[in-house]
Amino acid sequence: KKNQIVYMKGCDLVNDQTLESYLDQCNIDGKPGIKATFWNNPERQGEPVSSLRTTQPINVTTYGLHTFGPGVNLEKFSVKYETVLIPKESGEILLNLEGCSYFELLVNGKSMTKHRTWRTTDTRTMLQVEKGKEYKIEILYAQVENWAANLKFNLGKEFPINYSESISKLKGIDVVVFVGGISPQLEGEEMPVNIPGFKGGDRTDIE
C-alpha cells in the first residue's frame, strides 16, 4: 500500500471559523470563475496587456519576482477582477479581501472597502444575499509607490471549526504533522490589528 498524504486545515491564524467558498457559484460572461484584466500602468488606462480567468481563490504576489499575470510588470501595474455571484441560498456571506498597495472592493457598483497602504491589510466585508439574485463583484488593484504588491480574495459562508470532526478524520493515520505559529501579517510594530488577542500589532495571548 502506497503512503498517502492528506491535508486538513485545522485552524485559522486567529479566526475560529472556516470558510466554505462560493466561487463555484460565480461566473462572468457565461463562464465560471473570475475574470482578471491587466494593465501596465496604475490607472487601468489604454489597452490591457492581457487577461485571464480563474476558478480558484485569488492569491497573487510579486514576491520572488512573480507577476500577477501574463506580460504584467512587477511595478506600476493595475488589475480589474470581476465576477457575478448568484447564490444558491439566502443568508449572510463573507467577502474576504487582503492586499497591499491600492485595492478596492465593489458590489453592484457600490464601494464596500478601499485601502491604500504599504503593509498587507486584511478586510472582512459581510454581505446579506438572496437566493438567485445577481451580485456583480469587482476588485480594483494597483501597485503604487515603491510598496509591495500582493492580493488575496475569497468569498463564501463561514462555519465554526469542528475540532472533534477534525480529530475523528485522523483515525487510521500513523503520523500527524501540525504546522502553525505566528505571522508577520498580524504581528508587527504599531500594526492596525483590531481582533481579540491583540493590542495593535502586539499579541496579548496565544491560546
Spans of model-derived segments:
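C-terminal non-catalytic regions of proteins with extracellular/luminal or membrane-system context
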Residues: 1-207
